[in-house]
Amino acid sequence: MNGAVPMLAIDGPSGAGKGTVAGLLARRLGWNLLDSGALYRLLAFAAVNHGVDLTNEEALKVLAAHLDVQFVAADGSHGQRIILEGEEVTDVIRTEQVGAGASQVAALPAVRDALLQRQRAFREAPGLVADGRDMGTVVFPDAPLKIFLTASAEERARRRYLQLKAKGADVDQSALLEEIRERDERDSQRAVAPLKPADDAILLDSTEMSIEAVVETIIRHCERQGWDV
């Protein structure tokens, strides 16, 4: 790990707004962006496309090591376009089905190990904003600033419902709430890199906060680090 490069680690459960907040912060700071969840979504998506069973740990490990993926800076809520094997999959990998698959493969030790160095390679000058579920605990334990961003399951389901409805999807909010609760349990109970705040993380509950308020709150913490914002 390149500890000389400043970085901000943002962890939290599904639907807490990590991706949107991280993208906005990366643009504000002029730093690189790592959406670690996208890597697991990409792996799950690629596995299905290549006929690899999501329980086949060895095959998934090989696939993870050879993912042909590019992250291209762009406007929008996630701050980047994602290209897999030459095709843009930015929106395709954001479905609930792919998310469930990502949570499944993320529980496999060999998969997490295969993607670990790939994630750490994103830490380059002038800095990095990384979001995920184990950024501050496993991937970048030396990050000088760690945020654990959360919100109530009900609020996260509401946000996801509005997001999907805006895209024209036919979704049921109660079903989304159940999926979020199931994923929370799966992510927090897995044996490897379970979802939990780092001991030195700042806890931030965004249930009653706007995205803008969350960003400004984190920016104030960045200023305390002496970073140029």
UniProtKB/Swiss-Prot annotation:
Listed InterPro entries: Cytidylate_kin, Cytidylate_kinase_dom, P-loop_NTPase
GO annotation, biological process: nucleobase-containing small molecule interconversion; pyrimidine nucleotide metabolic process
Gene responsible for this protein: cmk
Family per similarity comment: Belongs to the cytidylate kinase family. Type 1 subfamily.
UniProt keyword list: ATP-binding, Cytoplasm, Kinase, Nucleotide-binding, Transferase
GO molecular function: (d)CMP kinase activity; ATP binding; CMP kinase activity; dCMP kinase activity
Protein residues bound to ATP: 12-20
Protein's name in the database: Cytidylate kinase
Catalyzed reactions: CMP + ATP = CDP + ADP; dCMP + ATP = dCDP + ADP
NCBIfam families named in the record: cmk
Main location as per UniProt: cytoplasm
SUPFAM superfamilies on file: P-loop containing nucleoside triphosphate hydrolases
Name of a matching Pfam family: Cytidylate_kin
EC number, as in UniProt: 2.7.4.25
Source organism (scientific name): Pseudomonas aeruginosa (strain ATCC 15692 / DSM 22644 / CIP 104116 / JCM 14847 / LMG 12228 / 1C / PRS 101 / PAO1)
